[in-house]
Structure formats: structure tokens, C-alpha cells
Amino acid sequence: RTFVSPPGGLYFSVILRPHAKPEALMHLTAMAAVAAARAVFAVSGVYPDIKWTNDLVLGGKKLCGILTEIGIEAESREVDYAVVGIGINCARVDLPPEVSAMSASLEAFTGQKPDRARLAAALVRSLCELEQALFTEKDAWLREFAAHCITIGQDVKLVRGDDVTYAHADGIDEEAALLVPYPDGTKAAVASGEVSVRGMYGYA
């Protein structure tokens, strides 16, 4: 997959140091999506949709992508650090047609180019606030994630390598895993690291 990062965007990584076991951070990417959405709203007045689990969407097109990873201490098996990488399309720019068709920007959507320094500050502040509430207020921000997640209620393709399965996204569980009933009557909670979820009728 090719990533396009044109001038005028906001691209950065934040290192967090939560004291937790790795399994307690299954929902880290979802938390980062809520943090990014809150920051975009604070700067632009627009709260973007969330495409499960790591994209923000405006007008059915991708505004922001999020990648997370964790490092584990060898002896304690606890999390040593967590890295949240975020890219937000801020400025209206010329992109290759195949990218432009699925790419949104804050300037194109709102008519105003955002202050990237202000957006970065809002995002770091939001991430730090949610890191503090990672466990104590988990239900609240998971509800916020679900309320803005456009994947829920949609027919989707679950792509795992060369294996493609069609399903309906029913909701998320307490770890932000996607709940999907399969056509054969079975159900599963799909974790973000296991599969790629793609919309049936377009990007989102």
C-alpha cells in the first residue's frame, strides 16, 4: 500500500507510557481515533465520522489515518511505551486521481485552512486527557466512538490476507472489537490487528 503525505498536512507521532499489560490496550487505536476527532472538532467545529477502527472520514472520504504500536518490557511483560502515529489532511492539494477520489481535507470541507499548530496542540492535549481516562472513563469514550462510527450498521468486507468474508457490522464490544454475525449464523468479535474492514459501496 502506498501512503501519500502531501505538504500542508499534519503528520506526527506521540509516545505514551501507560502502566498496563498489552492485553489492556486492545482499544488504544479506538481511543486515539476519538482523541483525533475531538481535536478536529475543537479547531474546525466539525466532528468527523470514524471508520472502524483507525480512520476519520468527512463526506465519505478519508481525512485522517492512525497507526499504533506498543513496546513490551521483556521481564515484566508490561507495556514499556505506546506510539500513536497520526496523519491529518489539512490543506487542499492536488493529488493523483486514484487518491483524490477517496481523500478529504479540512480546507476542502470547511473552506478554511486550519492552523496546524493549534490542531497539533489540541490533539496532544486530547490524547493526554484520554490516556488518563484510558481505564477509568473507558465506557464514556467507547460510547462516543460507537456513536460516530459509520462502520456500525453497514455491510462490510473482512479482508485477512487473501481471505475475504462478507458480514454485517452490528457494533463494538468493550475492547472496541467489531461485532459481526456471519451468514452461517456464527458471530465473532474482530480485533483491529486481525483484518482490514472495507465498505461494500465505496471507501467508508
Model feature map: region roles:
Residues A91-A101:
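Cytochrome P450 core scaffold surrounding the K-helix E-X-X-R motif
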Residues E137-G161:
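Short boundary/loop segments of OB/S1/cold-shock single-stranded nucleic-acid-binding domains
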Residues H19, E73, C90-V93, A177:
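Short, acidic Gly/Pro/Ser/Thr-rich loop/turn segments
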Residues Y81-V93:
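Active-site beta-strand/loop microenvironment that shapes enzyme catalytic pockets
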Residues G60-G65, L142, G153-D155, Y166:
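Conserved beta-strand residues within beta-sheet cores
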Residues I152-A204:
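Conserved RNA-binding domains used in RNP assembly and mRNA/RNA metabolism
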Residues R1-Y81, M102, F109-E137:
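Contiguous, small/hydrophobic- and glycine-enriched helical/loop subdomains that border
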